[in-house]
Amino acid sequence: MKPTDFAKKLTDFLSKYLPCERGLSTNTIESYKTTFILFITFMEEKKNIAVNKLAIKNITKENIIAFLEWLQSERHCSTATRNVRLAALHSFFRYLQYEMPENLNEWQQILSIKAKKNIKKNVNYLTVDGIQLLLQQPDQSTKKGRRDLVMLSLMYDCAARVQEIIDLTPAMIRLTKPYTIKIIGKGNKPRIVPLMEKQVIHLKRYLVENKLLESHANFSPLFSNSRNEKFTRQGIANILQTYANAARVKDSTLIPKLSPHSLKHSKAMHLLQAGVNLVYIRDILGHESVLTTEIYARADSKQKREAIENAYVDVINKESPIWVGNDNLLDWLKNFK
């Protein structure tokens, strides 16, 4: 069966343009791929257009808007996720502006779709007591418990995203003074984060126990699951939830609803509360702009009150390619790496 124009362009976009011309990371391409799996599913279920019939002419501004609404109304995606999907679609249609300029008017109409305003939620973070309680839960008499303690404490100490922890290798750690760790962030951007000596002591023991100081292990995953494979994001999230549930039994007031990103938020808040400059916090977190980091300053109501009280002046008196055929497009997308 002859492939449709949509299938050809999508294949080239994902397998050639994004990795080769744009140089995007594997994780970003994976997110784009998921967007198109969802879009194809929507077109099949809601527009009755089978994947082997889906053509460029079927992709209109109206259908894109309907897809975005479907994500929220039927798949219960957040506004942030909706906007991520729209960004992926926008990237594809910017690509098509040059590949298929004869449809430029349609592409520009799609590109005119605005991101939906997202109401910012309060930052969810643990207090210092909460972090201490959480990190008391791994059983250090077991190899798994020791691994989990090092992994979660490193995620907190380095304010690392879960994918950044997954991508760590022993070669990224400097075990001589000054102790540092190299973290590869979004867009493959590296940053160097200082390590504290107490953290390094635990880390060295872990590396020795798991034979990760040997030269052949330099580029092996720093943390592996029970099958000796690289962790998934969900795998680490499950580990965190196990210990969070155990900690809640001891003191539920200290352990709010958590995700791996909560550890990053917690470290940022603790640095802010300790008086660390936002510019330094920005660099540790790997934010491009200090404006992104300011969310933590806005979130700390206790610090806001203290600042207001300290500045108070008493003015009132005292009293007061890879793809071949349309039928396999969904399979190709799901298996594309």
Predicted features, each with a name:
Residues 1-337:
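Conserved catalytic core of the tyrosine transesterase superfamily
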